[in-house]
Amino acid sequence: MGGWLGRQRRLLRMGAGRFGAPMERQGRAAATSAAVGESADSEARRRDPLRRRASSAAPSGSGEAESVRRERPGSLGGSTSAGRPRAEGLRKRRPLFPWFGLDIGGTLVKLVYFEPKDITAEEEKEEVESLKSIRKYLTSNVAYGSTGIRDVHLELKDLTLCGRKGNLHFIRFPTHDMPAFIQMGRDKNFSSLHTVFCATGGGSYKFEQDFLTIGDLQLRKLDELDCLIKGILYIDSVGFNGRSQCYYFENPADSEKCQKLPFDLKNPYPLLLVNIGSGVSILAVYSKDNYKRVTGTSLGGGTFFGLCCLLTGCSTFEEALEMASRGDSTKVDKLVRDIYGGDYERFGLPGWAVASSFGNMMSKEKREAASKEDLARATLITITNNIGSIARMCALNENINQVVFVGNFLRVNTIAMRLLAYALDYWSKGQLKALFSEHEGYFGAVGALLELLKIP
């Protein structure tokens, strides 16, 4: 998304594509998308025979694609006759490069990209220029314009997917920049690569028509909870470049003694999965294929950021967190000790517990004494207390003692993670441990990639 973001928006305003198609029509666009995409792809293949050899193999389910696969000589798995059947089977199952998974959320778009590192000299020679351009653009940049970021510290190296070895890259950008991303796909000629994007999240419905009309790209829409479960189980199974993917906080309430420690999720079931994005969904997971959505709440990361924008005038999520880190919520919240003068011993409520979030703001004097940082901190504690309370009740009702918190709300948000960890430990009397994951916000996109590759 380089410096082209502003330029692409101008192109869109000048008529370079139909961004902004009526939303009520987008739910019906899937059938039209498939028909139009198939016709356009057939014509493009006629014009460009090199597409038949765009460094991997055509997706299954098409008679024409099967004939294309049979035309390709050689085996990617080696020259021995014993290895040929397996290699041929892998080639027939895997789609063409590039391999992407998309999770289009209400606030952020998460994209995972598999970069093949085992490309042979023959493949590189036959590789079309648009594919080389895409790979170079995504892997040689860390930032894409002012909003796109590749999380280099999360890169997974030396993975094997569908018989190909490579690295997995993790990229994010704000959802409001999706039109510019689609335009970039058009500029880089994505559609000539016979690319079908596997996408999850609400935006896969919202932007489906734009992908088709602007980028000439098809979206295969996937259930976001299916992708979430599949993604977290896969990432946990491959680990984090030799390190543990899962972790917890020891002594979360003590800033000096607090430690981040690895946790081995070798027996993941049953598992309570708390996905904190713009809103919150809570899932009870009993096996890879057996799970249910227990409940959720509309008070999530979007609520925190939105309220901080209103109360403090901040403009970014990172700015809101920075302000919260310097604030004192006790100047904003009414505590148990403010009501009882100390602990409420009969029900075991300590004096420092919050009795009423923002309760002190009823007083004019206390409103004037509270800083923007105090308001941001109180907002963060309000949201995390609510999520922690609901998660605890769900864990008790479902008789589950492993609670994993994921989602982009937790990105660079150690304060919230420690608050959740302490709340869960305190109110459960040590019976519940809050667990977290290094790739917290990318599991949906990983699940979408696995679906593209048909990995169970």
From Swiss-Prot:
Subcellular localization: Cytoplasm, Cytosol
Effect of a null allele: Single knockout mice show a reduction in pantothenate kinase (PANK) activity of about 30% and 60% in the liver and brain respectively. Pank1 and Pank2 double knockout mice develop progressively severe hypoglycemia and hyperketonemia by postnatal day 10 leading to their death by day 17. A reduction in PANK activity of about 90-95% seen in the liver and brain and hepatocytes show reduced NADH levels.
InterPro entries per the UniProt record, alphabetical: ATPase_NBD, Type_II_PanK
Reactions listed under catalytic activity: (R)-pantothenate + ATP = (R)-4'-phosphopantothenate + ADP + H(+)
Residues of the active site: E224
Main localization (coarse): cytoplasm
Residues where Phosphoserine is found: S55, S56, S75
Location of region: Disordered: 16-89
UniProt EC number: 2.7.1.33
Entry binding sites for acetyl-CoA: S278, S281, R293
Molecular function as annotated in GO: ATP binding; pantothenate kinase activity
Segments carrying motif Nuclear export signal: 154-161
Known pathway: Cofactor biosynthesis; coenzyme A biosynthesis; CoA from (R)-pantothenate: step 1/5
Pfam families referenced in this protein's UniProt entry, alphabetically: Fumble
Enzyme category, top tier: transferase
Cellular component per GO, a single term: mitochondrial intermembrane space
Entry keyword set: ATP-binding, Coenzyme A biosynthesis, Cytoplasm, Disease variant, Kinase, Nucleotide-binding, Phosphoprotein, Transferase, Transit peptide
Modulation of this protein's activity: Inhibited by acetyl-CoA. Inhibited by calcium hopantenate. Activated by palmitoylcarnitine.
GO biological process, one term: regulation of mitochondrial membrane potential
Oligomer status and interactors: Homodimer.
PANTHER family documented for this protein: PANTOTHENATE KINASE, PANTOTHENATE KINASE 2, MITOCHONDRIAL
NCBIfam families linked to this entry: panK_eukar
Function comment: Catalyzes the phosphorylation of pantothenate to generate 4'-phosphopantothenate in the first and rate-determining step of coenzyme A (CoA) synthesis.
Protein name as it appears in the record: Pantothenate kinase 2, mitochondrial
